[in-house]
Amino acid sequence: MLLLIKYTLLYGIVLMLVALGGMFSEHSGVINIALEGIMVVGGLAGVLVTASMPTTMAPALIVLAAVVAAAVCGMLYSLLLAFASINLKADQTIGGTALNMLATAIAMILAKNFNGSTSAKISYTNKPFLFSIGGLELSIFIPLGIVLLVVSYIVMYKTRFGLRLRACGEHPQAADSVGINVYRMRYAGVLISGFLGGVGGLAYVIPSVQTWNFEVGVAGTGFLALAVMIFGQWKPFNIFGAAMFFAVFKSLANIADSTVLAQLGWSSNIYNMMPFIASMVILSFTSTNSQAPKAEGVPYDKGSR
């Protein structure tokens, strides 16, 4: 039971962070399919910083440096999507898919260059990112994620910025008519998405293991986060609940060998498939009632106002 709680919290926070990133982007009017790639870039940046740090450095500084690197690199990578979608008015789905493929290729090249070999595996210490409560080893990203959840809610629903951001995703022409810079707000939404996606990528890669193979990227977690965002109806606390729900399924693969589930004799691949199967089943029943931002995915043309 403790293992289930541990991995549910670990994966739930990751899904929540990335889904919150998608929420900000889509509330601005930009569909961020590139969350998978942003996670890879953020995870790679954080891992490279962590692996490069001297072992004598204070753990808090290692965590801070890795998180900042992941967040900044995630934001920089998201700028590619923002420029293509907002300035060039490119198809956001195609652009995001291309960035997902590019991210994995970049990660493999940089990882192999870092190792000086043909292996894309990078080893590091994850101890600075872990803490214990009652004998249960947890990720430092759990309290950080809760803080970011509350901040996201406040920013989205209690500030002028959040009101303007949502206006740009619902009716950009009306927002523009009252003096809101739609392009700037959409850039802000995508950048925040990159920030949260990058941190989410680091939270996925580092705490659970001490070696990561970047040939596998983040194994579809970014796409699962999109399902979490939709199931959570683009609302922060709903997203948190949806993330924990899907995280239970994702955790089963990690605990199957050490629980009663081992008696079933099922392959771990079956458990790895469960969250994706659950997402398809749930979304097939709930998609008709989804209330997505009305202008998401639609490039804004100032001349058509």
What residues fall within each predicted segment?
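Short, non-helical or kinked segments that cap or interrupt transmembrane helices
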Residues: 24-45, 86-99, 164, 209-223, ...
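Cytosolic-side transmembrane-helix boundaries in multi-pass membrane proteins
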Residues: 152, 170-184, 257-305
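Loop-to-transmembrane alpha-helix initiation sites
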Residues: 93, 119-125, 137-144, 186, ...
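Transmembrane alpha-helical segments in multi-pass inner-membrane proteins
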Residues: 212-276
